[in-house]
Amino acid sequence: QALAVPCGKEDGGAFAYQPGKKGELVANNDASAAAVLGLLGKGMAVGDANAVKDPVCTKGDDLTAEQSAQNGAHYLAATLAASPYLEQPPMPGAEDAEPQPDFGNTADAVVSLAASGHKDKATASVKWLEKNAGTWAKQGGPAASAQLIFAAHATGADARDFGGTDLVKQLNATGPSPAATALPSPTPSGPQPSSGTESDDGGLGLWWLVGIGLLFGAGIGFLLSMRRKKQQP
């Protein structure tokens, strides 16, 4: 809870990336989405589940992991209620000084809301991603496609027709080819397995590729974060 913004304050329930120079906590969308999943003990491959009661922000210094996660979900739900997408500040030196849509963290927030039982709070965001994230996913490489696949999977959307884009095919096209699913050893009396490999849609191969994509994206995000810190006075 050391990085959680207390409920009742501005952006209450959110999580900070790290304390400021004076110990202040500033809400960070990336940290908030990740904290919700981490506190719930869930990974990115969250299954589609029915929504439960609305998230609440619980005050206190001795909260359970579940309560802290729900606080984070409360912040994400409130933020996405005001706008279907999260924003990111402009890069230092950028010509456009206005905040830009943050496709990646919006997708991650969708997964976190679904994981915490608030899929209904992410409905508008999923629709927004379907309509607007196509170009970003193509330019962002495997990590971007993977994030959208997870968001679709968590909310019951079709990853093979996400705003007209087959995200699975797009991810597979980045390579390497999906690994074939292991087949049982044949027995003299049993059926003989097919000699071919799984199609490019193979379940194990898909999630393996998704994992590789997210690791790649995490590395890029870390490098950008370090670059921003170096450019700050």
Where are these regions (language model features)?
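Buried hydrophobic core positions in alpha-solenoid tandem helical repeats
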Residues: 1-3, 76, 129, 171
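An alpha-helical repeat/solenoid feature that recognizes helix-turn-helix modules
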Residues: 1-50, 61-71, 78, 82-121, ...
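Alpha-helical repeat scaffolds
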Residues: 49-54, 122-134, 161-175
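Primarily N-terminal secretory
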Residues: 54-60
